[in-house]
């Protein structure tokens, strides 16, 4: 049990930091030919090697929920699982629709109205897009739970092999029924379960996953840079999608590395990791508030090698502190479950 706690705590921490990094570097991405090449390469490099962040959160969900051996209770599931995520999402979507109306020039109510009217189809703020494909996954989790308990492991392995094959087709723009967003995201659920429950935890296996992951990251960075230089503008194709083989391999690597090294953390580090993990969803939901002035007032002048870490710390610490304050009251802690 101790391994499980530390393992998932560490995963949530590294994923939260990586998500913030992706959002911090955003102003640099499209500056090819505007800022020095080394600065652009730094930002694009960080973007290329952190795309596993969001998929890792889905892997965690799959690993935990598919490992749950309790009988399925529909009422409990809707109230305690789905509702626990859906209701806060709706409230934060409304808040961020309001925030979207604020710019350095002032407040625009028309922008808020437009954002809210489009909210059934588009996120009200850039980081909330995650929930538009994460929440629907709750409708297929019971199916995967049944499969995990009742079918032979080879069925799961065959499913994952086919899913990864279709993600490869999608990466290379070979589209078909397999290009459906729900199909491409839901494979992360049984993958998380298999990585947690079925893959042996030994050095050779972790080395294998690490090798595949590092190659995937290197290829991703190379393709993004090459395509952008050829087009003379920032061009990523599908290499930075969350639904492609390269990102699946990178996310699997992070999962296995955290699983392998999680137990070796010093006690003082474990405490910090556990605290951050408890507030990882709060950090995810709240950090854009602290990035708002950076983006609106252009407070990112400087080399991204130091600007990105600085804003990760500032926005991450601010979001962590705010999440902690929310957790101190029963009236507010449900907003950041």
Task: Give each language-model segment a name.
Residues 4-16, 78-79, 83, 203-216, ...:
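Functional transmembrane helices that form membrane-embedded active or gating regions
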Residues 6-67, 88-89, 93:
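Functionally critical transmembrane alpha-helices in membrane proteins and complexes, commonly lining
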Residues 42-55, 118-133, 170-188, 221-253:
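Interfacial loop-to-helix transition and helix-capping segments at the boundaries
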Residues 47-56, 68-100, 109-124, 137, ...:
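Transmembrane alpha-helical segments and their boundary/interface "anchor" motifs
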Residues 57-58, 66-67, 95-105, 111-196:
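Hydrophobic alpha-helical segments with transmembrane-like composition
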Residues 202-274:
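Alpha-helical transmembrane segments and terminal signal-anchor/GPI-anchor hydrophobic tails
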Residues 238-249, 300-320:
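Membrane-interface transmembrane-helix boundary segments in multi-pass integral membrane proteins
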């Amino acid at each position: 049990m101790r391994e499980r706690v530390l393992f998932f705590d560490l995963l949530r921490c590294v994923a939260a930091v990586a998500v913030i990094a992706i959002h911090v570097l955003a102003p640099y991405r499209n500056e090819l030919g505007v800022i020095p090449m080394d600065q652009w390469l730094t930002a694009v490099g960080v973007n290329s090697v952190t795309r596993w962040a969001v998929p890792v959160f889905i892997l965690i969900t799959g690993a935990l929920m598919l490992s749950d051996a309790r009988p399925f209770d529909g009422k409990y599931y809707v109230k305690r699982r789905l509702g626990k995520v859906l209701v806060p999402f709706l409230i934060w979507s409304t808040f961020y629709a309001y925030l979207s109306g604020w710019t350095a020039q002032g407040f625009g109510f028309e922008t808020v109205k437009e954002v809210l009217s489009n909210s059934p189809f588009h996120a009200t703020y850039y980081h909330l897009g995650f929930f538009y494909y994460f929440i629907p996954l709750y409708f297929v989790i019971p199916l995967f739970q049944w499969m995990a308990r009742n079918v032979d492991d080879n069925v799961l392995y065959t499913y994952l092999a086919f899913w990864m094959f279709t993600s490869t087709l999608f990466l290379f723009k070979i589209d078909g029924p397999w290009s459906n967003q729900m199909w491409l995201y839901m494979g992360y659920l049984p993958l998380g379960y298999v990585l947690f429950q079925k893959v042996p935890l030994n050095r050779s296996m972790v080395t294998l996953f690490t090798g595949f992951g590092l190659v995937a990251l290197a290829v991703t960075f190379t393709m993004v840079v090459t395509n952008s230089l050829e087009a003379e503008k920032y061009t990523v194709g599908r290499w930075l999608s969350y639904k492609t083989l390269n990102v699946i391999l990178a996310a699997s690597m992070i999962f296995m590395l955290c699983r392998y090294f999680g137990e070796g953390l010093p006690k003082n580090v474990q405490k910090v990791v556990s605290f951050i993990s408890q507030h990882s969803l709060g950090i995810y939901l709240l950090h854009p508030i602290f990035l708002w002035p950076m983006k609106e007032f252009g407070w990112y002048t400087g080399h991204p090698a130091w600007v990105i870490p600085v804003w990760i710390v500032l926005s991450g610490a601010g979001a962590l502190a705010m999440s902690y304050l929310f957790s101190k009251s029963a009236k507010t802690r449900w907003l950041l479950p």
